């Protein structure tokens, strides 16, 4: 009887010690105990693999085979509209992200909005669709950026602003100014000085015309520039003795055409802003409205769930 009690007590002690070991093995120091127990244990040798011995022909063939084919997708203009926080350093972070990917920004306009602490950033760049989409997502992951909208395939209204100072004395006087600037910035340019003297000796040069004839030419040039500017929707904002300043707000292609047309008069100075863009508001036709109504009815009432008959 006493022996059986001792045996049962021994089993209970062993069971409790095993349970204690199990509980200890799952504690936070189990990893430390494992490292202490296996500190002096010899580690098994690492497996060795014999690398194949290649020659130059095999290596070149493998490199050519593994090199991906260049993308044949054409590069096109992309318009990105970024909604960002109005705080210092946002512009540098966005432009740095694009520069890291090798993009050349064609146009960049940043301005405040009607909402406090919110700015709008319009970026125009050239690139492939996939690469630009990756850059757009990377910019959108920046902390001060709310969202980046891609207006590339959307119907948008584009506008740029240009101010140009145009000569009223004609192309000859403009060429005289260019040559004079060339001689003043390059020492010892004897050929340019000879060209200046040759142009000034011509009969049609403003310096050789009577004052009344020069006045008539200036008014004719001003009238032509004013009519051309009005046809493009711009206006003359300043007139001086030898030049005038015109202002025009239009889409980029129209501004480029205007500058090309006033180039013969002599563009002395030009300041052109970047492109601003806003999406057009879609207008639905009667057919699209009927299709939307049918779709709403089909979503509300599922014909397959109706009872037969």
UniProtKB/Swiss-Prot annotation:
Biochemical pathway: Amino-acid biosynthesis; L-isoleucine biosynthesis; L-isoleucine from 2-oxobutanoate: step 1/4; Amino-acid biosynthesis; L-valine biosynthesis; L-valine from pyruvate: step 1/4
Keywords for this protein: Amino-acid biosynthesis, Branched-chain amino acid biosynthesis, Mitochondrion, Transit peptide
UniProt similarity note: Belongs to the acetolactate synthase small subunit family.
InterPro entries recorded: Acetalactate_synth_ssu, Acetolactate_synth/TF_NikR_C, Acetolactate_synth_ssu_C, ACT-like_dom_sf, ACT_dom, AHAS_ACT, AHAS_small-like_ACT, ALS_regulatory_subunit
One Pfam family matching this protein: ACT_AHAS_ss
Organism: Saccharomyces cerevisiae (strain ATCC 204508 / S288c) (Baker's yeast)
Subcellular location: Mitochondrion
Cellular component annotations (GO), alphabetically ordered: acetolactate synthase complex; mitochondrial nucleoid; mitochondrion
FT transit peptide: 1-24
Protein name listed in UniProt: Acetolactate synthase small subunit, mitochondrial
């Amino acid at each position: 009887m006493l022996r059986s009690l001792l045996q049962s007590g021994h089993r209970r002690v062993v069971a409790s010690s095993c349970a204690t070991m199990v509980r200890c093995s799952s504690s936070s120091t189990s990893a430390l105990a494992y490292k202490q127990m296996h500190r002096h244990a010899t580690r098994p040798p690492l497996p060795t693999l014999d690398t194949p011995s290649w020659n130059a022909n095999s290596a070149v063939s493998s490199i050519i085979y593994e090199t991906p084919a260049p993308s044949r997708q054409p590069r096109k203009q992309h318009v990105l509209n970024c909604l960002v926080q109005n705080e210092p350093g946002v512009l540098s972070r966005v432009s740095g992200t694009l520069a890291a990917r090798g993009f050349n920004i064609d146009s960049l306009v940043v301005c405040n909005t009607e909402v406090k602490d919110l700015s709008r950033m319009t970026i125009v760049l050239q690139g492939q669709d996939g690469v630009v989409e990756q850059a757009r997502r990377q910019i959108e992951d920046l902390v001060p950026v709310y969202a980046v909208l891609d207006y590339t395939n959307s119907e948008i209204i584009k506008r740029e602003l240009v101010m140009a100072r145009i000569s009223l004395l004609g192309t000859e006087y403009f060429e005289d100014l260019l040559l004079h600037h060339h001689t003043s910035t390059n020492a010892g340019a004897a050929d340019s000085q000879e060209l200046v003297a040759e142009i000034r000796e011509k009969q049609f040069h403003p310096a050789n015309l009577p004052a009344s004839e020069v006045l008539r030419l200036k008014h004719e040039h001003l009238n032509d520039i004013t009519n051309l500017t009005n046809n493009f929707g711009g206006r003359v904002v300043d007139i001086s003795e030898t030049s005038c300043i015109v202002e025009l707000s239009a889409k980029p292609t129209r501004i480029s055409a205007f500058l090309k047309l006033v180039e013969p008069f002599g563009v002395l100075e030009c300041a052109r802003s970047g492109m601003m863009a806003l999406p057009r508001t879609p207008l639905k036709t009667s057919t699209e409205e009927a299709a939307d109504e049918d779709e709403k009815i089909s979503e509300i009432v599922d014909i397959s769930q109706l009872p037969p008959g």
